[in-house]
Amino acid sequence: MSPSAVDDAPKATGAAISVKPNIGVFTNPKHDLWISEAEPSADAVKSGADLKPGEVTIAVRSTGICGSDVHFWHAGCIGPMIVEGDHILGHESAGEVIAVHPTVSSLQIGDRVAIEPNIICNACEPCLTGRYNGCEKVEFLSTPPVPGLLRRYVNHPAVWCHKIGNMSWENGALLEPLSVALAGMQRAKVQLGDPVLVCGAGPIGLVSMLCAAAAGACPLVITDISESRLAFAKEICPRVTTHRIEIGKSAEETAKSIVSSFGGVEPAVTLECTGVESSIAAAIWASKFGGKVFVIGVGKNEISIPFMRASVREVDIQLQYRYSNTWPRAIRLIESGVIDLSKFVTHRFPLEDAVKAFETSADPKSGAIKVMIQSLD
């Protein structure tokens, strides 16, 4: 049974699509960044020859640059995940289905989808208990050695492609960072009226702030070292209180100033989105007795924390690894307008200018919140 694939001028949502050469954004252990030919080839996209059972071919439209993408480029690793050869980046993507294997019935050519960037084994305990983010054999796109989504075309299992209807391509790509925040909210168990601290006004911190606000956190405080990022936080969430972190202060001193921003109330839950040792320590010092510090951010392999402060105050410390079962919820939140990410994309680049896009994302002076790469016109 041969795959059902696009022709040289395939139809999708009523318009002809020409298949261009497939190119991708690569890095390597030498920290080079470049654009080169990628798989599947244009010929394979046209014929559907590379499609496996259960897969569809997606013409990627928009991909956001994540901090982890920049980290793999600059550092060559995140913990034990090491770039060992030529490696394609990107895992925040949405696009259009342009070819469907005959075994797939859930999607058809022309469907607009967001790509959940993992492939799991469906056999290990985490998979069988619904926590597939802990899959022992997971292939997470853009995490070495699995190539990422910063390409024009990609084959992906249909089960991990979520229909987004008329949602914009950019919002479809932003479902991935929203899923990170939702996973944190779900496990941190933020409740109506909880005083919530969000550490870090980067994309994940900002999305987490919006989620906490939607969940009824009150009061709500967000911290950062950047005045411009805090101003952006206030713009998209007027009721948040912003708190600029002063570099050089001890964690205990920082905690006291944070509690002052709460009006003397100690946070019940902290959504720590930086992974920075000093920020985690300050959050522990600031927490109420029986409070929780939930670490979403990615940090160093080993850090020091104020252990006895956490002990005598019974502060729960939890951590997060990616997400599971969040995408349908994320889609509903954006479609309904409960979460508005329309201002998040501050910079846009075509795929051909991806190197400049990465330089912009990595430059603190650029003012970038989310840099979006558009793979196709």
Swiss-Prot record:
Listed under catalytic activity are:
L-arabinitol + NAD(+) = L-xylulose + NADH + H(+)
Conditions for induction: Only expressed when grown on L-arabinose.
Needed cofactors, names only, are: Zn(2+)
Instruction: Give the Enzyme Commission number.
Output: 1.1.1.12
Pfam families referenced in this protein's UniProt entry, alphabetically:
ADH_N, ADH_zinc_N
Q: Which UniProt keywords apply?
A: Arabinose catabolism, Carbohydrate metabolism, Galactose metabolism, Metal-binding, NAD, Oxidoreductase, Xylose metabolism, Zinc
Could you describe the post-translational modifications of this protein? The N-terminus is blocked.
The relationship between pH and activity is given as: Optimum pH is 9.4. Active from pH 7 to pH 11.
Q: Which InterPro entries match?
A: ADH-like_C, ADH-like_N, GroES-like_sf, NAD(P)-bd_dom_sf, SDH-like
**Biological process per Gene Ontology, one example term:** arabinose catabolic process
Entry coiled-coil feature ranges = none
Notes on temperature effects? Optimum temperature is 55-65 degrees Celsius.
The record's cofactor note says: Binds 2 Zn(2+) ions per subunit.
Q: Which residues bind Zn(2+) 1?
A: 66, 91-92, 176
> SUPFAM superfamilies, alphabetically?
GroES-like, NAD(P)-binding Rossmann-fold domains
Q: Where does NAD(+) bind?
A: 203-204, 224, 229, 296, 320-322
Answer whether the UniProt record assigns the keyword Cytoplasm to this protein.
Answer: no
Q: How does it assemble?
A: Homotetramer.
Give the record's family classification. Answer: Belongs to the zinc-containing alcohol dehydrogenase family.
Q: What does this protein do?
A: Catalyzes the NAD-dependent oxidation of L-arabinitol to L-xylulose in the fungal L-arabinose catabolic pathway. L-arabinose catabolism is important for using plant material as a carbon source. Can partially compensate for xylitol dehydrogenase in xdh1 mutants. Also oxidizes galactitol to L-xylo-3-hexulose as an alternative to the standard Leloir pathway for D-galactose metabolism. NADP cannot act as a cosubstrate.
Name of the protein described by the UniProt record:
L-arabinitol 4-dehydrogenase
